[in-house]
Regions:
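Membrane-embedded alpha-helical segments that form the functional core of polytopic membrane enzymes
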Residues: 1-23, 91-100, 149-172
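Residue-level detector of solvent-exposed, low-hydrophobicity positions
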Residues: 8, 33-36, 40, 113, ...
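Aspartate-rich (DDxxD/NDxxD/DxxxD) Mg2+/diphosphate-binding motifs
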Residues: 20-67
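Acidic-enriched, low-complexity/disordered segments with a strong bias for Aspartate over Glutamate
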Residues: 25-28, 34-35, 109, 147, ...
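Short helix-coil transition/hinge motifs at the ends and kinks of transmembrane helices
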Residues: 37-42, 82-89, 142-153
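Intramembrane alpha-helical segments
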Residues: 47-143
Length: 173
């Protein structure tokens, strides 16, 4: 067990959440989706930080970019610690690539998964298997030492399903 890795994983996950929310607010603003929402509630319409003037669109975009770059930086550092190479071929590299795609592609151009009926699936994947399996891989590293045959990925995948469903249901409302 490594407390350093725990804090890095937690920090990366928090930055990923900030990046996802900020990019969602920014792209929903640029598409006018949040502006045309006349019945915004805690369950729809984003955080409304742009609409009520708490932040400018540029500030929200900078928040998203700094957060996603921080997430990527932490992920690459962890990957280097595990594999010996920044871009070493590990599950962390691939979950990081998928997570970045989901975070920015949720409402970001040109993908806009949330506008094409794939928003709930993207959220379930991002908060379920991507985060849970990534964290599990890093935090159980001393037990498998980067040997995929020893990594209990099925256990992590099963543990991610309830989380994926619960987080997905937040936006289902």
């Amino acid at each position: 067990w490594s407390w350093n890795m725990f804090w890095l994983v937690l920090g990366g996950a928090c930055l990923a959440q900030i990046a996802t929310n900020a990019s969602n607010d920014y792209f929903d603003h640029t598409s006018s989706a949040d502006e045309i929402n006349k019945v915004a509630s805690p369950f729809n319409g984003g955080s409304r930080v742009i609409q009520v003037g708490l932040m400018t669109p540029g500030q929200v975009l900078i928040t998203a970019l700094v957060s996603i770059l921080g997430t990527i930086g932490i992920g690459l550092y962890i990957n280097q610690q595990i594999s010996g190479y920044i871009f070493g071929n590990t599950p962390i590299l691939w979950t990081g690539i998928l997570g970045t795609f989901l975070a920015l592609g949720y409402t970001g151009d040109p993908v806009r998964l949330g506008y094409k009926g794939f928003g709930e699936i993207a959220i379930a994947l991002g908060f379920g298997p991507v985060m849970v399996m990534g964290a599990h891989y890093v935090l159980t590293f001393p037990m498998h030492n980067n040997d995929l045959a020893l990594w209990n990925w099925a256990e992590a995948l099963l543990a991610s399903i309830p989380i994926a469903l619960l987080v997905m249901l937040i936006v289902w409302i």
